[in-house]
């Protein structure tokens, strides 16, 4: 997965081992030659807290017309719990997805989401990036991977790839949001 912004590009390679466990993550950060593009600091939860508004563009694997929808994302912290609420206005009406995570007690750069069939983790990475992925992939279970990048203090992009129970790619969503509160 990869994102481009200005003269910078961020790519991520995620490898699961033969036991379907998340094994290796390679974050590739690039910029055009002869540019003094400063690297952004590692992403933190504090960078995300608040209200974000923008839009999501989803392309399905059948390559039909992309679906564009407005989004509102809110991040809140309550002790060691983190609540992320995503509101989207889809063709089927308003949809709200709320996810609750807990901070890893040994590493503040990791969030654990446990309410799904697959345990999910978010890893805060260098250069304002983060990865959200299953800790392990289960046979015949659909899953999502998400690469996020804080491009500027109040501008955030997220690419979400969705896979079906056969492991086939079904959709790709690009979310671009600005912090409004």
Question: Residue spans of the language-model regions?
Answer:
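Central antiparallel beta-sheet cores of small beta-barrel/beta-sandwich binding domains
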Residues: 1, 64-138
């Amino acid at each position: 997965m990869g994102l481009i912004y200005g003269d910078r590009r961020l790519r991520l390679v995620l490898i699961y081992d033969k036991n379907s466990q998340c094994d290796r993550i390679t974050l590739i950060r690039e910029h055009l030659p002869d540019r003094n593009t400063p690297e952004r600091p590692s992403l933190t939860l504090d960078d995300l807290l608040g209200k974000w508004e923008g839009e999501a563009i989803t392309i399905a694997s059948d390559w039909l017309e992309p679906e564009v929808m407005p989004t509102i994302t809110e991040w809140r912290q309550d002790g060691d719990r983190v609540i992320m609420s995503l509101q989207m206005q889809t063709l089927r009406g308003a949809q709200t997805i709320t996810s609750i995570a807990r901070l890893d007690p040994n590493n503040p750069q990791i969030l654990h989401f446990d309410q799904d069939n697959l345990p999910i983790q978010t890893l805060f990475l260098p250069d304002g990036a983060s990865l959200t992925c299953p800790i392990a992939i289960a046979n015949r279970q659909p899953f999502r991977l998400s690469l996020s990048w804080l491009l500027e203090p109040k501008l955030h992009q997220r690419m979400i790839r969705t896979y079906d129970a056969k492991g086939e790619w079904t959709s790709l969503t690009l979310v671009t949001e600005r912090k409004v509160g």
